[in-house]
Amino acid sequence: MNKQVVYFSNSGNNKRLAQRIADYNGLSAIPIIPTNTYPSNYHELTSRARQERFHHIDVQIHPVKLAKNTDTLILVSPIWYADLPRPVITFLKQLQRPYQRIIFVSDKFMLGFGFCRRTLRKYVPSSTNIEMIAATSNDFSTIISILKNS
């Protein structure tokens, strides 16, 4: 299977995790970058993320180039307010074709995946197999076991 790693990370935790996954697979990790960067101040960041989430604000992102022969998309992202961050939703809306499999990986897993599966399902075809992995860059064993089976 041809894999591609795409990630969104504001603090750097999910970036490190995505790079580790990409290195394991001999790939590069492609970032999802909002055109309007998020503030580094925690209060300002959470205020903006909360407003985007609950008002369903579309967040513009820089173009993400994906290989045409990819059948497995490994999407690494935090979970903000029990759902995917709005830049990730913009990315999903811009996908040009279906994927056989999407593996969603999140670092800083605390309360579960919330609405993430529902949101992924909303933007990808029903034929796409969605897998969810809670992991950290320090404990890579769960990710390795899933990736070995792909």
Region roles according to the model:
Residues 106-112:
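Short beta-alpha junction loops
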Residues 128-150:
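Glycine-rich phosphate/pyrophosphate-binding loop and the adjoining helix
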